[in-house]
Amino acid sequence: MCRRAGVGAVDLLHADEWQVAREAGLECSTGYPARRRDFIARGFNDPANHALLLGELERTLPIARRAGVRNVIAMFGNRADGRTEQEGIDACVEGLSRIAPLAEETGVTIVLEMLNSKVDHAGYDADSTRYGVAVVSQVASPRVRLLYDIYHMQVMEGDVIRTIRTHHQWFAHYHTAGNPGRNELDARQELQYPAIMRAIADTGFDGWVAHEFIPTRDPEAGLREAVRLCDV
């Protein structure tokens, strides 16, 4: 289906799935470092998680390099009572600074995703571009960057094109979905994806844009339409 729709990669696969994508003629655009039910909630904003997260990335980054997977995802984590936002940011900087040298050595980029806490991920700490940029700008590694999810940030803050133009140097990967609903990129939702894709292209971005919508009708038709809209 992906190849028929004009898609060249599949996003968010685990290491034991990367070969399946390759055999189908597809790249894995972003890989997972682990299978955990608490993957989103348990992130770098809590120092108690660092040993676990660093171990997962230390195992996965060399495998990703050998497999040709350019990005591996990580999460900021959920809020906790008694921990301020700044303490969470500081913890992220400390933990990610420890893994950045290995990411640079392997040439694999760790991408951290901001999510909306309003609709889909209540309690998630990094629910703004400001939070994400505060972290990666302090880590200051070309291999620790952000996954800018257009849907999630439209829910939380809007102003998508201006944000891309202002902060694109920190963005290594993008996700799409329609808003409201997180469904197809069609006329029932508010985001103007051709204009957004032109703004991304104008920054010189040469990575992947991944479609992460929940289909409400024929999935292949929705994917074809998304590819058509975003091909600028």
Regions inferred by a protein language model and the residue ranges of each:
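Short glycine/serine/threonine/alanine-rich loop segments
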Residues: V7, L26, V69, V108, ...
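Conserved beta-strand positions in the central sheet of alpha/beta enzyme cores
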Residues: A9-D11, S29-T30, I73, V111, ...
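Active-site-proximal loop/turn and secondary-structure-junction residues that shape catalytic pockets
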Residues: H14-D16, A34-R36, G77-A80, M114-K118, ...
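Histidine-acidic metal/acid-base catalytic patches
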Residues: M1-R4, G68-R70, A126-Y148, H152-V232
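Active-site acidic/histidine proton-transfer and metal-coordination neighborhood
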Residues: G43-R145, V155
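Active-site-adjacent beta->alpha loops and helix N-cap segments on the catalytic face
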Residues: A15-L26, G82, L191
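Catalytic domains of carbohydrate-active enzymes, especially glycoside hydrolases
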Residues: M1-V20, T60, G68
